[in-house]
């Protein structure tokens, strides 16, 4: 009490609430250091931690390890509670926090021991994989209806679904083939004489069992989906 503080001890860091002392003065040739802040309550229970993890907020990125943003949760590390982070004075052997290694250059994040650093190109667009936005989300290309297989513009999508789902199923007439009639396009087997067929209003014919299965998930002719 009453003692005269040194000039270095009275120097203030760039952050409010940061108290500095002689230990906050960076050693010759050492990395920049912002001092310490106190997290405890009483005089005997005060603990100081390094706040150099906020490098990039008031510090030249070239000296802060190039980290544009950081989210830091203090965690105790051995004697002295010293922390190693980009821009801090940590050991050079910990390459995780060294320049260029504390975050993913491709825009991802790196999380370790409560620390999260976002890369210089981190953005929502970079984080999302391309397959999450299919081509049919575009208002120009529209999408293909899974019911009738028609291409529909995105602004007409809701109305089309309502009409497509409420459209009555096609009716057909049963018949028995009197002669061979080529291939059934559903099962790709031949329509032979004596087979029971279904004749649709468009005059297309199929095996009755095939068209019944088709109409369980579709409401139009396999060869005339627009009808």
UniProtKB/Swiss-Prot annotation:
The modification Phosphoserine is found at residues 50, 52-53, 123. The keyword Metal-binding applies. It is an enzyme of class 2 (transferase). Its main location: other. It is a peripheral membrane protein. InterPro entries: Znf_RING (IPR001841), Znf_RING/FYVE/PHD (IPR013083), ZNRF_ubiq-protein_ligase (IPR051878). Changing residue 184 to A: Dominant negative mutant; can prevent Wallerian degeneration when overexpressed. Disruption phenotype: ZNRF1-deficient mice are more resistant to infection by encephalomyocarditis virus (ECMV) and SARS-CoV-2 with enhanced type I interferon production. However, the display exacerbated lung barrier damage triggered by antiviral immunity, leading to enhanced susceptibility to respiratory bacterial superinfections. Mice are also are more resistant to LPS and CLP-induced sepsis. Its EC number is 2.3.2.27. PROSITE patterns: ZF_RING_2. GO terms for cellular component: cytosol; endosome; lysosome; membrane; synaptic vesicle membrane. GO terms for molecular function: ubiquitin protein ligase activity; ubiquitin-protein transferase activity; zinc ion binding. A zinc finger (RING-type) spans 184-225. Keywords: Cytoplasmic vesicle, Endosome, Lipoprotein, Lysosome, Membrane, Metal-binding, Myristate, Phosphoprotein, Synapse, Transferase, Ubl conjugation, Ubl conjugation pathway, Zinc, Zinc-finger. PANTHER family: E3 UBIQUITIN-PROTEIN LIGASE ZNRF1, E3 UBIQUITIN-PROTEIN LIGASE ZNRF1-LIKE PROTEIN. This is E3 ubiquitin-protein ligase ZNRF1. It comes from Mus musculus. The gene is Znrf1.
